[in-house]
Amino acid sequence: MMRFSAQDDYTAGETDSLLYIPEGRWVDGAQCHIWTFLGEFWSQPGTRFDDRVISEYAKKVTDKGGVLTLEVGTMARSGRDTRAGSDTSATIGIIDPEQVRQLKLIIWEVRRAAQQKTKNK
């Protein structure tokens, strides 16, 4: 992670791996921000990480004060499927349900870990 300019107040953070764990909230005076995708690639549906793996990573990043943004794929089918005779325009912009499920789990796990940490102080 790096700060690209003195004007940046957070790191851009684009990555395709879960290898980077911040040492703390700040990287060269900028908020540590990590941005990766849940699907097989940017803007793709599905989940490429096991629930436990991505949840543990999110907890490690946020525990150090870092920020994690998880990019999701939206359904992009549109128009009329003449083979099926149905209108598929209702799926445009809908987040993949499997990614929604995984995001909810990650949020729950991060909140639970933060509450446990607060309780143990």
Identify what each model region corresponds to.
Residues M1-K121:
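Mature catalytic domains of secreted/periplasmic carbohydrate-active enzymes
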